[in-house]
Amino acid sequence: MAKQSMKAREAKRAKLVTKFAEKRAALKVLISDVNASEEDRWNAVLKLQSLPRDSSASRQRNRCNQTGRPHGYLRKFGLSRIKVREACMKGEIPGLRKASW
């Protein structure tokens, strides 16, 4: 189990990402616009740098919904490989069963 503080930190990051997503996207469009003046582009870079570091989507880490485990995360289920296996063995995931060949 991950510490509660780590789970809370990831939740805080998720909120920041959604809060600043539009603003970050607009600034990135302005920065990559070759028709904009150099001064406008540079000001956009400075504004982007002034945003909170955790508002970047690349700072987020996918974590298991049950345990908070950061490694072995399966996006399709939102769980770590360990919890997916446990749920599979109990028959809690429809259509998923242990491989046999």
From Swiss-Prot:
It comes from the Bacteria. Keywords: Ribonucleoprotein, Ribosomal protein, RNA-binding, rRNA-binding. InterPro entries: Ribosomal_uS14, Ribosomal_uS14_bac/plastid, Ribosomal_uS14_CS. GO terms for cellular component: cytoplasm; small ribosomal subunit. Gene3D superfamilies: 1.10.287.1480. GO terms for molecular function: rRNA binding; structural constituent of ribosome. PROSITE patterns: RIBOSOMAL_S14. GO terms for biological process: translation. Binds 16S rRNA, required for the assembly of 30S particles and may also be responsible for determining the conformation of the 16S rRNA at the A site. Belongs to the universal ribosomal protein uS14 family. Part of the 30S ribosomal subunit. Contacts proteins S3 and S10. HAMAP family: Ribosomal_uS14_1 (MF_00537). This is Small ribosomal subunit protein uS14. It comes from Aliivibrio salmonicida (strain LFI1238).
